[in-house]
A protein has these predicted regions:
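Short helix-loop-beta junction
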Residues: 51-64
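A short, aliphatic-rich alpha-helical micro-motif
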Residues: 78-82, 112
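A short, well-structured beta->alpha microelement
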Residues: 62-78
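Catalytic nucleophile loop
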Residues: 88-91, 111-133
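C-terminal and late-domain segments of enzyme folds
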Residues: 1-29, 39-47, 55-56, 134, ...
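Glycine/threonine-rich flexible loop motifs
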Residues: 94-103
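Conserved beta-strand elements of the Class I
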Residues: 33-35
């Protein structure tokens, strides 16, 4: 999910909760248990968001939200993933989220490979990638997006992410102007293309074709190569809401 605030949007979260319910039912649970992981840095995400994630999930269907909150600089205990049917990683300062989930990475990969539904919200979506865009607004001292979207970083910064999807992900695309960061990172060869997701919009990645839910678009960015494999440009298109 590319961010935004839509606590009453049943479409955005209904599929995720339904998949968690199927997984829970397989072990005899009538109500799915969903881990909600939140990292707070300088009161971001705000109390409204921290308290609102369970309500957003409930809009998608009956579930039990198990919320764990840590401060930036701290890490999650691996026990937060015990006996759950779904995992939501929330939004906030993206580098802090990647640091906080470090002890969970191998376990998350195994669980998702085994069918555990994963929902990344803003920062949680960005770190789901093989190579995660953590933030930044400059490439070689050249501005590539608004500084307000920099995540407390100057140069555009990447790191190994959770490895759940093989394309880079940026968020708040139309609202914060981060699409240009992904375009510039692709043209510079920092990433091999990816997607930038609008707010109140979800990209669903599963065994079938990619799907888009919500009110916005998912912007697909791909490098254009010459016969020698050198990047000569970037193509941009949208995956529209079905």
């Amino acid at each position: 999910v590319g961010g935004g605030w839509s606590p009453d949007d049943t479409e955005l979260y209904g599929l995720f909760v339904a998949e968690a319910a199927v997984r829970g039912a397989a072990v005899g649970r009538a109500v799915p248990r969903i881990a909600v992981l939140i990292v707070v840095a300088d009161d971001s995400p705000s109390a409204e968001f921290r308290d609102g994630y369970p309500a957003m999930l409930a809009a998608g269907g009956r579930c039990e939200a198990l919320t764990t909150i840590v401060a930036a600089g701290d890490e999650f205990d691996t026990r937060v993933l015990s006996d759950v049917d779904g995992l939501l990683v929330a939004g906030g300062l993206t580098p802090a989220y990647l640091d906080a989930v470090a002890p969970l990475i191998d376990q998350v990969r195994l669980l998702v490979a085994d069918g555990l539904p994963y929902l990344g919200f803003s920062a949680g979506a960005m770190i789901a990638a093989d190579r995660a865009v953590l933030g930044g607004w400059l490439i070689g001292d050249v501005p590539v997006c608004p500084e307000d979207a920099a995540e407390d970083l100057d140069e555009v910064t990447l790191a190994d992410g959770l490895g759940l999807v093989d394309l880079a992900i940026d968020v708040h695309a139309a609202q914060w102007g981060t699409l240009t960061r992904l375009i510039a990172a692709t043209e510079a060869g920092l990433v091999r293309g990816g997607v930038a997701i609008d707010e109140n919009t979800a990209l669903v990645v599963g065994e079938g074709a990619l799907a888009v839910l919500g009110t916005g678009s998912v912007w697909r960015v791909e490098p254009q190569l010459d016969d020698d494999g050198e990047i000569v440009g970037v193509s941009v298109g949208t995956l529209g809401v079905e």
